[in-house]
Amino acid sequence: MVSPLQFLRLLLLWVPASRGDVVMTQSPAFLSVTPGEKVTITCQASEGIGNYLYWYQQKPDQAPKLLIKYASQSISGVPSRFSGSGSGTDFTFTISSLEAEDAATYYCQQGNKHP
């Protein structure tokens, strides 16, 4: 059995879009990594959203935790190994050196357009 600490789970949601919806595509869908590795996750919007992009971490039985706001702005108390970049349609989330405690589901959310 593989320890869950060896895995970084990434959430990839696909929801059929109504006219005007912004569709977010995140990749990769799953990563198997070890502590110390650099992790990069990308998120692409179906249309430009400026810098209205947020990155979250969620662990089992816990609420999502905001890590990055406005594409690249760090959140107080979040370790500096977490960073984000990008604008418009293409965004990147990076964990510079993975730690065992980082095993979780990560996802992006756009905040430019609401249903």
From Swiss-Prot:
Alphabetized UniProt keyword annotations: Adaptive immunity, Cell membrane, Disulfide bond, Immunity, Immunoglobulin, Immunoglobulin domain, Membrane, Secreted, Signal
Subcellular location: Secreted; Cell membrane
Region (Framework-2): 55-69
One example of a Gene Ontology biological process annotation: immune response
Signal peptide as annotated in the record: 1-20
Location of the region described as Framework-1 in the Swiss-Prot/TrEMBL record: 21-43
Cellular-component GO terms for this entry: extracellular region; immunoglobulin complex; plasma membrane
Sequence segments annotated as region (Complementarity-determining-1): 44-54
Cysteine pairings via disulfide bonds: 43-108
Coiled-coil regions, chain positions: none
Protein's UniProt keywords contain Disulfide bond: yes
Sequence segments annotated as region (Complementarity-determining-2): 70-76
Pfam families: V-set
Region of interest (Framework-3), ranges: 77-108
Ig-like domain: residues covered: 21-115
Chain intervals for the UniProt region annotation (Complementarity-determining-3): 109-115
Known partners and oligomeric status: Immunoglobulins are composed of two identical heavy chains and two identical light chains; disulfide-linked.
Protein purpose: Probable non-functional open reading frame (ORF) of V region of the variable domain of immunoglobulin light chains. Non-functional ORF generally cannot participate in the synthesis of a productive immunoglobulin chain due to altered V-(D)-J or switch recombination and/or splicing site (at mRNA level) and/or conserved amino acid change (protein level). Immunoglobulins, also known as antibodies, are membrane-bound or secreted glycoproteins produced by B lymphocytes.
Protein name (Swiss-Prot/TrEMBL): Probable non-functional immunoglobulin kappa variable 6D-41
Record gene name: IGKV6D-41
